[in-house]
Amino acid sequence: DEALRAGWWEGFVRPGPSVEPKVLFIMGNNPLRRLRGGTRTLLEELWPKLGKVITVDFRWSTTALYSDIVLPAAFFYEKEQFHTLTSSEVRFWAYGQKAIDPVGDSRSEWSMVNGLARTIARRASERGLDEYQVPHGVTPERCKAVLGRALTIPDALRPILGTLRHFHEIPDLLTMNGKYSEDDVEQALKDMVERCKDAGIFEGEESLEKIRARGFVKYN
């Protein structure tokens, strides 16, 4: 609340206070269980405002039980991934190797997101929608970082600032024009390792092959 009052989050709070949320999409979290007072405060204050709650999970979590739609996620051994164990005491990423294909209708999160991207593009075309605005771009904080001084952005300009995108481009943006395949995360994991090396998170001699053989990787 203090940060909001002081304006430190100006331009980053989306949606604004005047916009009532309509859809809550939850992936990799269980807010009704993990947040303090979740089953009381959230169910009483937030849930009645929502038209749809969608949860992605491999089990019937507390949040899933209160969701309108539950998308069954693949379990740990049904997809290839890194398990991030992050704390001041544990500085390792564990490598999770796929042992079997997803059971039943379950899918990996990556597969789900690709499917949603294609569906959004298709439904937008069916409804005659072409463009949408991404709320990034000129903000007081960015102006101060680049110019050394903050600029006051008139309220009338705020809706048109940001990046203009097209709905039909969403699938290609997600896969970087087909570089990443929905059915194979090999290239994405390799690039993840390389970007971590570039940022100094992993040591320079690391590679996906070495991490696979070792089963884990230490990060800085």
Protein language model annotation of sequence segments:
Residues 1-162, 166-171, 175-179:
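Non-catalytic alpha/beta scaffold blocks inside enzyme catalytic domains
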Residues 144-220:
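Long, low-complexity segments enriched in small/aliphatic residues
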